[in-house]
């Protein structure tokens, strides 16, 4: 009888960089552009909600404290989403730089990509 292979399901499936093959820079650029746009959308949405809660705090003095807390939380979420959009913008720029290096035939690997 053949022993059954046991598959262990882990939380994270890590792949070696060597096994991935060539990088599709166009796909990577589109991916980061999409995430950047989602980050911008999140910033606008959270900012709008913060303004709404600020208005509610003035309009509803009985529950003003609750609305002010929710305003602060929404403002923090807007800042976080803005930071994410900024991060993705730079990831997109790095992908464009790597694509240009590839097209030029430059084989040096950026130290950013190693860590």
UniProtKB/Swiss-Prot annotation:
Biased composition (Basic residues): 1-15
Compartmental location: Nucleus
Induction / repression: Induced by leaf water deficit and fruit ripening.
GO biological process: response to water deprivation; response to zinc ion
Chain intervals with Basic and acidic residues compositional bias: 86-105
GO cellular component: nucleus; protein-containing complex
InterPro entries named among the record's database cross-references: ABA_WDS
Keywords: Nucleus
GO molecular function per UniProt: identical protein binding; nucleic acid binding; zinc ion binding
Domain of life: Eukaryota
Predominant location: nucleus
Region (Disordered): 1-22, 83-115
Family: Belongs to the abscisic acid and water stress-induced protein family.
Protein name listed in UniProt: Abscisic stress-ripening protein 1
Organism (species): Solanum lycopersicum (Tomato)
